[in-house]
Amino acid sequence: MQTEQPPKESQTENTVSEPQEKALRTVFDDKINFNLKHPLARPWTLWFLMPPTPGLEWNELQKNIITFNSVEEFWGIHNNINPASSLPIKSDYSFFREGVRPEWEDVHNKTGGKWAFQNKGRGGNALDEMWLTTVLAAIGETLDPTGQEVMGVVINMRKGFYRLAVWTKSCNNREVLMEIGTRFKQVLNLPRSETIEFSAHEDSSKSGSTRAKTRMSV
C-alpha cells in the first residue's frame, strides 16, 4: 500500500532569494551603488562663500550649493568637493539647517552667537579631519543636548589662518552653550591648553568684525 508523501517544504519559504539579498545595499556595503538611505534628523544645506568679486555684493557671494537629508547624500557631497584646506583665501564652507542662511542678519541667527577655534596656516590634512568631524557632529545632532541651538558650522579660510565655528540660535543660554562648547572642543580633539571662545553675533555686527569680545571660553 502506498502512503501519500507529505508535500516538501519549499526551500524558498524560509530563505531570502539571491536577488532579494542584493536588493538592499547601504553605503557601508557599496559606496557607489547603495540604495538604502539613513535619514538625518533634519535636512542640511551646503553653502560656499566665494572670495570678494568686483560687482557682487557680499550676499551675492554666498552660494546655496545643495540640500541633503541622509547620511549617504552627505558622503556623496563630501567625496565630490574640494577639501577645506584647499579653499581659496577669503572663502568659506558652511553647513546649515535648511532654511537658515550663514549670515548674522538671518532671523534664526541674529540673537545668537558662535563658538570658534582659530589657528595659523592652512591646516592641511589635520584641518580637513577637524572640519569633517565638526560637520558630522552637527548633522548627527551630537553637539547640541537640546537639538534646538546649533544652526550650522563654518570654516573660514583667511590669509595666514583658518577658523572653525559652530553657530548657535541664542547667546544667553549659558548652561547649554557651555555644553556645546565643551563638546565642540572634544570633537576637535584639542589639548586642554587650547581655548575656544564664544562671541555674540550682535557684538560682531556692531564692531564690524568677526573677532568680537569673548563672552565665554572653554
From Swiss-Prot:
Keywords on record: Initiation factor, Protein biosynthesis, RNA-binding, Translation regulation
SUPFAM superfamilies annotated for this entry? eIF4e-like
Spell out the Basic and acidic residues composition-biased ranges.
1-11
Family that this chain belongs to: Belongs to the eukaryotic initiation factor 4E family.
Region (Disordered) spans which residues?
Answer: 1-20, 198-218
MF terms per GO, please? RNA 7-methylguanosine cap binding; translation initiation factor activity
Gene3D superfamilies in the record: RNA Cap, Translation Initiation Factor Eif4e
Q: Determine if Protein biosynthesis is one of this entry's keywords.
A: yes
Q: Which organism is it from?
A: Schizosaccharomyces pombe (strain 972 / ATCC 24843) (Fission yeast)
- Give one Pfam hit by family name: IF4E
Subunit arrangement?
eIF4F is a multi-subunit complex, the composition of which varies with external and internal environmental conditions. It is composed of at least eIF4A, eIF4E and eIF4G. eIF4E is also known to interact with other partners.
**Biological process (GO) annotations?**
cytoplasmic translational initiation; nuclear-transcribed mRNA catabolic process, nonsense-mediated decay; regulation of translation; translational initiation
Q: What is this protein called?
A: Eukaryotic translation initiation factor 4E-1
Give the CC-aspect GO terms.
Answer: cytoplasmic stress granule; cytosol; eukaryotic translation initiation factor 4F complex
Q: What highest taxon heads this organism's lineage?
A: Eukaryota
InterPro entries on file: TIF_eIF4e-like, TIF_eIF_4E, TIF_eIF_4E_CS
What does this protein do, in the record's words?
A: Recognizes and binds the 7-methylguanosine-containing mRNA cap during an early step in the initiation of protein synthesis and facilitates ribosome binding by inducing the unwinding of the mRNAs secondary structures.
Q: Has keyword RNA-binding?
A: yes
Per UniProt, the ranges with Polar residues bias are: 206-218
